[in-house]
């Protein structure tokens, strides 16, 4: 089964994560199929490639609970930012 999950990178004590598509039976930082975006919890920044995300979800990849929560929070923030500025949210480009 394919999973959209977080892959840890960054230095000790300064975590950053890549959002990747991988086989759910693989190690957390093991082989992955595609990098879909990134998340930096220290800066509270994230970037998700929605085209690739949609492509992999159509192929059967399911986000983990953590990634689903991240996507939900990120989408809510982007819609609020776009609503206030009247433009497309830069996070989703």
From Swiss-Prot:
| GO BP term, pick one | translation
The protein's UniProt keywords, in alphabetical order, are: Ribonucleoprotein, Ribosomal protein
Q: Which domain of life is it from?
A: Bacteria
Alphabetical list of Pfam families matching this protein: Ribosomal_S16 (PF00886)
| GO cellular component terms, A-Z | cytoplasm; small ribosomal subunit
Molecular-function GO terms, alphabetical: structural constituent of ribosome
Is this entry keyworded Ribonucleoprotein?
Answer: yes
Family to which the UniProt record says this protein belongs: Belongs to the bacterial ribosomal protein bS16 family.
Q: Record's PANTHER family? A: 30S RIBOSOMAL PROTEIN S16 (PTHR12919), SMALL RIBOSOMAL SUBUNIT PROTEIN BS16M (PTHR12919:SF20)
- Protein name per UniProt: Small ribosomal subunit protein bS16
Q: Which organism is it from?
A: Tremblaya princeps
């Amino acid at each position: 089964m394919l999973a959209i999950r977080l892959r840890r990178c960054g230095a000790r004590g300064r975590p950053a994560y890549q959002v990747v598509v991988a086989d759910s039976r693989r190690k957390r930082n093991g082989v992955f199929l595609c990098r879909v975006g990134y998340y930096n919890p220290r800066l509270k920044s994230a970037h998700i490639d929605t085209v690739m995300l949609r492509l992999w979800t159509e192929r059967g990849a399911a986000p983990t609970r953590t990634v689903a929560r991240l996507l939900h929070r990120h989408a809510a923030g982007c819609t609020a930012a776009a609503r206030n500025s009247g433009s497309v949210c830069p996070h989703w480009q």
